[in-house]
Amino acid sequence: MGSIGANNAVADPTPLFSSRVQKWEPGAIRSLLPLEALPGMISLVAGKPSPETFPIAEIAISLKDTPAGTGRIVVDGDELNQALQYGLPRGNAQLIQWFESLQRSVHGLDENGGWSCCIGNGSQELIHRVIQVFTDPGDPVLLETPAYPGVAGFLRADGQELIPVYSDAQGLNPASLEQALSEWPGDSPRPKVLYTTPTGSNPTGQSCTESRKAEILRLAKRFNFIILEDDAYYYLNYGDDKQRARSYLALERDVNGESGRVVRFDSLSKIVSPGMRLGILTAQAAVVDKVVRITENINLQPSSTTQLLALSLLRHWGQAGFLKHCAEAAEVYRRRRDVFVSAAERHLQGRATWVVPTAGMFVWLELKLPPEMDSFELLKSQGMKNGVLAIPGVAFMPGNEQTCYIRVSFSLVPERDMDEACRRIAGLVDRCACHS
């Protein structure tokens, strides 16, 4: 992986590209679509339906009264026709520009740093595409563990070798990462990617400290791998802003004197709407281009309609309004966390341990179970019977190891039910202890 330039060099990711991604060829039709915008061009290219056949006259959105502002957004005319028509594989150009401006403001990216953004149908689709860019079936992948099962699931189905890198209360542990890489067999290719969820991690709820991120970035340069920064909960950070860790994307230049090893994923799912299915990829242009090539050959594009709805909302808010909305959403989850943690302190002291999260919507409970019992068996045999459900820790273990952990989500359960939920979990632990 070479460098371009001297100061603030750009690491070239292309030597790490997989064999399979080279097989994707440009779509013969989709690659011509940007040329339709050239002045004076008469296009006979695309088999697009005529807008006069679209039955929708306008889309109107009424906004809630929030600190980000209120109002009504109407999409009609040519803009509506654009929202109902085929679009570009990379995504709506204006929406991409909006997010590129946000990344410069929030993460301090250079105007001409060789990076760009593209849009996907949710960040998980983009993560899957980037995995295809860098790995072939059977390749090893470094996976923050406990791991988000959505990604672990498709990695396992793709035949990848999952290499656990363990996290704790301070996030991903660089000592675990260094050990895995230092002890790697010399006759086997090293992993080329590390997947991590650094803020309000799903499932642990923990956030990686800035000092640890710096150590991990140094390891990425030393062992020549790419960091996949899945940061869906970044804007749901309700901790002390002064102690908030910068993103890997923001830190990379300061730590390593270069950029290009971090591929970042953002999402509107947790802060606007999961039903919109909009994710944002930020990476070196060569990586984005490969992702776009896969998109144009598989599902053509992200949804034009939801992209334009999102763009209309974000333009209405502006960056300041967007950040105000995110802060208000984070405050909602902070209050809900406080209610849940208070209930846990009343009922689960001595029965479980946990670390209070500073972002996201999860608490990772370590139940005090007998050695022969794991949380999956407990929930399967007693959870439904006693009217309480949570996700057993085995769901987040790449090797399906037994564990005494459970993941609880406080995002949707009514606050009035949190106390009873913790009381029922305590009852499960007590009954398990009595029968051991």
Swiss-Prot record:
N6-(pyridoxal phosphate)lysine: residues bearing it: 270
PANTHER family named among the record's database cross-references: AMINOTRANSFERASE (PTHR42790), KYNURENINE_ALPHA-AMINOADIPATE AMINOTRANSFERASE, MITOCHONDRIAL (PTHR42790:SF19)
Organism (species): Emericella nidulans (strain FGSC A4 / ATCC 38163 / CBS 112.46 / NRRL 194 / M139)
Higher taxonomy: Eukaryota, Fungi, Dikarya, Ascomycota, Pezizomycotina
Secretion signal, residue range per the UniProt entry: none
Triggers of expression: Expression is positively regulated by the secondary metabolism regulator laeA.
Protein name per the record: Aminotransferase tdiD
Needed cofactors: pyridoxal 5'-phosphate
GO biological process, one term: alpha-amino acid metabolic process
Pathway: Secondary metabolite biosynthesis
Any one GO molecular function term: tryptophan-phenylpyruvate transaminase activity
